[in-house]
Amino acid sequence: MPPEPDEAGDAAQPGVHRATPRLLIATSVPSTLTAFLLPYAEHYRQAGWRVEAISNGVSRVARCVAAFDAVHEIGWTRKPTDPGNLTSAPARLRQVVREGGYDIVHAHDPIAAFVTRYALRGLRAAGTVKVVYTAHGFHFYRGAPPVQATVFRALERVASDWTDRLIVINQEDLAAAQAFPLARRGGVVYMPGIGVDTAKYGRDALDPAGAARVRGELGLAADQPLLTMIAEFNPGKRHKDAVAALAASGLEDAVLALAGDGPLVGEVTALAADLGIGERVRALGYRNDIPDILAASTAVLLPSEREGLPRSLMEASSLEVPVITTRIRGVTELVTPETGILHDVGDVPALAAAMRRVVEDPEAAREMGRKGRLKMAEFDLRNVTALHDELYAGLLTDRP
């Protein structure tokens, strides 16, 4: 790793305590902020904190500019081999942290978290700042490619020495983190995800006109089935399984709506055309009306091979929409046979059968949705923000 040319200078400048706590949230890309973290910015700003964000491209996202007290650009990327992640990005981050005088820096994805902890290790050792990482799903999960798992496990073990608190959001990751020395120092904390706002994602909170608008936009008849998947178009989400399952399901009038962006949009829509269902597979792009899309849906799909604790399933269940998903880490903590339908990764026939089941037995589907809503109480955003309050308070008390 390249040296930190100004680390000695950083370490010589302890943090200055202020009456107003200062929090910097670090992510590789702004979509992580908009998808998961804006409620935290609102919560802590209302509590009297100064909350800022650093991400690549964040100043061009109006929702982020409005949500935070300030936003900062940084040139890191989500590509692990990008040399800038360990050359220019650390110096930029140290500059922002020195100027901002933050009490806590909280990172939220693997690359940003590794670079953050590497860059701030001198400041942290000097007691200038506390560093927190929420792992939204380790890359060394059960069933991961062996080389990938070995590399990411080793990197996380190293970086955990530069971490004050590591938050994990599922039981498999909690077990894995117990092997790190950080766990023996009490630095590993379990939280049930990043929370779902069950008040916002509740049938009573939504105007039915929103769901009607979505169905009208898609040209659906009143009783026409709508199967929805909300996920970035990347290989691990396995959109092609959803398309292939729809083609095999025999549900000739069902529509599959795919909300999200990503590099595989063209491949997925081409597959739909090749299978003769191109007109029934709709790539919706990035959307700001996810609650209405979910409320308009017959069921929500997520055939992923890797997840942490998927927000889309939490939101769907909170809205009493049945879910069809894979039997993998994190997901099985959210979904049981009573609240949804689970299948093995890559099992397209099972996914097709699940589609038929929710369409052909609507009462059973509604009962899954009702039970899913009850299950989400333990993942409510208010519970998770209270856990963050407790964690942050402990870190502030522990400041020199």
Each model region followed by its residue ranges:
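N-terminal strand-loop element at the rim of the active site
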Residues: 15-20, 24-85, 173-181, 186-190, ...
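A conserved mid-protein helix/loop that constitutes part of the nucleotide-sugar donor-binding site
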Residues: 34-39, 225-248, 263-269, 314, ...
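Donor nucleotide-sugar binding/catalytic pocket of nucleotide-sugar-dependent glycosyltransferases
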Residues: 72-75, 157-211
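Short His-centered aromatic/hydrophobic patch
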Residues: 107-113
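A short, well-ordered alpha-helix in the C-terminal region of glycosyltransferases
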Residues: 213-216, 267, 357, 364-378, ...
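Aromatic "clamp/platform" in nucleotide-sugar-dependent glycosyltransferases that forms part
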Residues: 286, 305
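Short hydrophobic beta-strand element within catalytic cores of glycosyltransferases
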Residues: 322-325
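Conserved acidic donor-binding segment of nucleotide-sugar-dependent glycosyltransferases
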Residues: 337-348, 357-363, 377
